[in-house]
């Protein structure tokens, strides 16, 4: 309960941008200004708020890594960034600022690295970086997007999830409806 409260309070406070990677992407979806008119919470105001994603506590229990998704209603897409803060909610820092949708961040190597999924290489692959966001390295080169992963206890092996095409998809049958998902 205390950890959840710290995470919530830390996410509400402005993060300090330290060692933030800039992509030069002018269409980067990030934190928006929330505008509440006439004291009413509108759908636009709700979409302007970031959505906290998964969080993971460091092995020593002192730090928390978590993600926040930001949305663009006009573009109909989102982007997720990685943050690190102390377990008490202090020293909240955004460690990524890219258009590559980093997610699933977890501590590895005794808390000296953060593993995460990112589509910087063209499809979602497994990456690692330092807790300050520096020294990003790709760890996987799977032929397709990785949707989830789990390291073995000794961190020598990785189990990952990826969708494999089986049969005909809706988009294969109806190419004029590329966003359709049901039959």
Describe every region a protein language model picked out.
Residues 13-15:
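Bacterial signal peptide processing site
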Residues 44-80:
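Beta-strand-rich domains and repeat architectures in extracellular enzymes and scaffolds
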Residues 9-11:
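C-terminal motif of bacterial Sec signal peptides marking the signal peptidase cleavage site
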Residues 18-29, 80, 161-183:
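Predominantly five- to eight-bladed beta-propeller fold
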